[in-house]
């Protein structure tokens, strides 16, 4: 195991040997339902990468609870349940959603008596109407397109065991779904997934990541992420051509080459720019970096030392 800055660099084979006591509690069909459109993951990936990760999270969860109990004893007050919040960051199309859903499923199996919930920060984007009013549609996904105050209130309420609700975002309509919310109420574990969860907004005195008990950054080379982004775009077109209400319908029934050309331009002018300027700089704030190579295979991990 190579030491690198303030991270341990751990190759896949070494990581997979850290914890082999439990068999993967998933079937192929269940795993298929958890993965995103064009993401690739196998039961072997779950066994080699995610089962050791769940064991590591269990160590942090136990430490989290022990700290809360000890601090309450020190203060002479009754111990309160404080939700454990796990943040998952990374570029568009890198596979964050699959990682988040898979961890939710595995943690629910490991902790059958605990409530494990998941939300994405997509729901805290301003609605398209508001983005247009602010002339921000071309900046959708950049820091200024999110209602960060609302997101901060949300995670603060969760930490304080107050009922909280997260707006729902639909990739089908490419907008916030009016009147729909994900209700989060007294979870034991909350997973917060999004490109912006480790960012440091310049106009805030407190950050979303201040509420995290553990954070993961899903990483890959730019060229691979672009490839996955374009693959996902084509998959969306393949599923949208029968649904006129789908945001991608006009592109699905139009000239495919022109649609792909447009997607490449969006990648270059928006997603790649956002990755380089605002997402990648947050990588070294994560507790764990999961690095992917071809076919979404995790080939190495970087675990923060302290």
From Swiss-Prot:
Gene3D superfamilies assigned to the protein according to its UniProt record, in alphabetical order: P-loop containing nucleotide triphosphate hydrolases
Protein EC: 2.7.1.33
InterPro entries: P-loop_NTPase, PanK, PRK/URK
Entry keyword annotation includes DNA repair: no
Residues that bind ATP: 90-97
Principal location: cytoplasm
Keywords linked to the UniProt accession: ATP-binding, Coenzyme A biosynthesis, Cytoplasm, Kinase, Nucleotide-binding, Transferase
GO molecular function: ATP binding; pantothenate kinase activity
An example Gene Ontology CC term for this record: cytoplasm
Keyword Phosphoprotein assigned: no
Pfam families on file: PRK (PF00485)
Subcellular locations according to the entry: Cytoplasm
GO biological process: one example: coenzyme A biosynthetic process
Catalyzed reactions per annotation: (R)-pantothenate + ATP = (R)-4'-phosphopantothenate + ADP + H(+)
Enzyme class: transferase
Functional pathway: Cofactor biosynthesis; coenzyme A biosynthesis; CoA from (R)-pantothenate: step 1/5
HAMAP family linked: Pantothen_kinase_1
UniProt family annotation: Belongs to the prokaryotic pantothenate kinase family.
Protein name: Pantothenate kinase
Organism: Ligilactobacillus salivarius (strain UCC118) (Lactobacillus salivarius)
């Amino acid at each position: 195991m190579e030491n690198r800055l303030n991270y341990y660099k751990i190759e896949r084979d070494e990581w997979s040997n850290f914890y082999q006591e439990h068999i993967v509690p998933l079937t192929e069909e269940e795993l298929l339902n958890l993965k995103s459109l064009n993401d690739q993951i196998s039961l072997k990936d779950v066994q080699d990468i995610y089962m050791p990760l769940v064991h590591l999270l269990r160590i942090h969860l136990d430490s989290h609870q022990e700290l809360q109990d000890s601090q309450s004893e020190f203060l002479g007050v009754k111990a309160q349940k404080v939700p454990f919040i796990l943040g998952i960051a990374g570029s568009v199309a890198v596979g964050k959603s699959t990682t988040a859903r898979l961890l939710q499923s595995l943690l629910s199996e490991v902790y059958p008596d605990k409530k494990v919930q998941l939300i994405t920060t997509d729901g805290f984007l301003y609605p398209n109407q508001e983005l247009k009013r602010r002339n921000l549609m071309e900046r959708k996904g950049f820091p200024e397109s999110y209602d960060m105050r609302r997101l901060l209130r949300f995670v603060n309420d969760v930490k304080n065991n107050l009922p909280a609700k997260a707006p729902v975002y639909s990739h089908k309509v490419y907008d916030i779904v009016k009147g729909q919310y994900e209700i989060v109420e007294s979870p034991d574990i909350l997973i917060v997934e999004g490109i912006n969860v480790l960012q440091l907004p310049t106009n805030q005195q407190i950050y979303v990541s201040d509420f995290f008990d553990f954070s993961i950054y899903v990483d890959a080379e730019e060229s691979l992420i672009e490839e996955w982004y374009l693959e996902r775009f084509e998959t969306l077109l393949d599923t949208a051509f029968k649904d006129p209400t789908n945001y991608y319908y006009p592109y699905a029934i139009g000239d495919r080459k022109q649609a792909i050309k447009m997607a490449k331009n969006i990648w270059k002018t928006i997603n790649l720019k956002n990755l380089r300027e605002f997402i990648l700089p947050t990588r070294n704030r994560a507790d764990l970096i999961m690095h992917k190579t071809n076919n979404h295979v995790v080939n190495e991990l970087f675990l923060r030392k302290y």
